[in-house]
Amino acid sequence: MQIMSRPQMLVVAAALGLAFSQTVLAAPAAALAGNPLATASTLPFHYPAFDKIKDEHFLPAYAEGMRQQLKEIDAIANNKKPATFDNTIVAMEKSGALLTRVQTTFGNLQGANTNDKLDAIDSEMSPKLAAHGDAIYLNPKLYARVKALYDKRDSLKLDAESKHLLERYHTDFVRAGAKLSAADKEKLKAINGVIATLQTTFTQNVLKETNASALVVDTREELAGMSDAEIDAAAAAAKAKGKDGKFLVALVNTSGQPPLAVLKNRAVRSRLMAVSLARGANGGEFDNRQVVLKIAKARAEKATLLGYENYAAYSLEDQTAHDTAAVNKLLGELAKPAVNNARKEAADLQAVVDADKGGFKIEAGDWAYYTDKVRAQRFAFDENQLKPYFELDNVLINGVFYAATKLYGITFKERKDLPVYNPDVRVFDVFDADGKQLAIFIADMYARSNKQGGAWMNEYISQSTLLGTKSVVANHLNIPKPPAGEPTLLTYDEVKTAFHEFGHALHGMFSNVKYPRFSGTSVPRDFVEYPSQVNEMWAVWPEVLANYAKHYKTGAPMPKELLDKVIASKKFNQGFMTTEYLAASLLDQRWHQLTPAQIPTDVLAFEAQSLKDMGVDFAPVPPRYRTTYFSHSFSGGYSAGYYAYLWSEKLDADTVEWFKEKGGLKRENGDWFRAKLLSRGGTDDAMNLFHNFRGRDPVIEPLLERRGLTGK
């Protein structure tokens, strides 16, 4: 679950702290005549005209967008008048209107609905966009104006948000290399171009390798345990790939694969686990091992050039964690108890295998299957009992939306008149409690072969009172689409994901800021997952669950005893879940705490040794992502930042306790959370926002209790 919980994008204006303006400041060039990207969409809230946008529109719009922004930046940098907040900082906030529109639209479509043409454009534009960013942030005249304002910021009589914006711009320039010598700036530009190209290659390799690695089986019997609908879908997928009469089991992003929980055939489970873990290291054209080494080295070189010990130190300085010591401490303290719990869980699973006279030791491919058996014994239910109560439309309308209405007073109305890029995409108007339209919400729920894996939120239009814009946000999930006429039944994890991603959407839709630099989810990476994690609590809140968890055939509510078992089982398998997450987080840190001279030559050997060194080398529980398909770390914006989910969960667990103390699903609670935190975006230090909401700093005890790490 990522926001970045969003597709892998290079939204230049966002990354640079520049505007999400939707108004072109200069007349589009003749080359853009008839190009729908040339001007802001005339649809409500500047919603993209998906029916008019074609692949061939992007490259000329990119070129003109970069030209326009550089012209605007040149005018700011060479302004003969002394620097003022308005003629420098605000002017930069308003720059790049066309480029922002092009890059936002392209990045979102390339994540959700890509093709070979878009992939080729991405490969071509990534280094060009990196160079474009360098041309702005390494402009000495522009930095001189920013620094002049920064040095006298206390005497400028700026309001709090404006002062924070000035400070952020100064920080952004310094971190981008504005203080480097001319020679070192040229070195940095070259490194940035290399990184941009490599990250694009990594992303495309992961998607292509994941598709190419789908497991093909010969007989229906081998898929025993999967539902008839799932097996029929596997047959249809195989036929679509020219393998008529066979069955194709597609892969998801993570190491673990959903069918592993139900497949009865151990040989098939082992094959499925093996192809998942081998992705990106098969020796073919999509092998990512050399790409990983080059990315790690380039990032380490960038950090060294900027004066940091390693890339993690550079990356974390700008997060709420601030340094590697804090992250290493958190992850290190949790690793041993988490693995101990996982070993205890493995013993429970082995006992079931032995009782069944299985004659084998539990391996990674067996874990989910026997976990379900133990869950069924201990709590007397399994996933298949839950799914009939989790029909997609009920979950979204009567669950996710219902909770938001009860908490915040917002309402939703589906509309069919706006264009979409895929027929399965749905669009909703979102209205505030006073009846005024707040935002437009796009729901893209189904998996597709041309859609990146995982789940994320992104914004097509970001809220800003300076620019007069309101939010157009989208949630993307990867729920397998059932055969025509069959209901879409979700797993419990998919239900939680739907609530999680809508937490990101609320963060975007509730944004009430002046400057686009601070809009919505424009907060530190280790804070951005916090509001979305909080929103997960409503998935099993009794009033909410009773409203949506109804049998898709009979409409009967989920029996209370089944709900009680679901809630009672929440700590179950936490050893596994915490260990697989920690293993990935620690790998992410290990790769990014290397100096250029320490980059290894063998990716898999380094990975194995790192897991051993960190005490999380427990074979039945592989990392949630192995290095060669770890998109968060090597292309998805979470480099040296995968720890952020756990860091944010500390805030989340503490906030859940606050909601419970205050009576839970009450409008006054939602209004307080919205006013103090969700609406504020990045207008203040993230931990100040938390303190203002909670009345104190966060404590870790609720997280330890949730994860079963208290030793009780």
Task: Show the residue positions of the predicted features.
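Short pre-active-site segment immediately N-terminal to the catalytic Zn-binding motif
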Residues: 480-499
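Short His/Asp/Glu-rich catalytic/ion-coordination signatures at enzyme active sites or charged loops
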Residues: 42-57, 106-125, 148-190, 250-290, ...
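Short, hydrophobic/amphipathic alpha-helical patches that form generic packing surfaces
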Residues: 97-108, 167, 171, 274, ...
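N-terminal helix-rich structural modules
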Residues: 27-232, 659
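Surface-exposed patches in mature extracellular/periplasmic domains of secreted proteins
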Residues: 75-80, 84, 311, 413-417, ...
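C-terminal, non-catalytic "cap/extension" segments appended to globular domains
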Residues: 29-54, 225, 241, 246-248, ...
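Active-site-proximal, well-structured secondary-structure segments within enzyme catalytic domains
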Residues: 161, 165, 197, 204, ...
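Gram-negative bacterial Sec-dependent N-terminal signal peptides
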Residues: 1-25
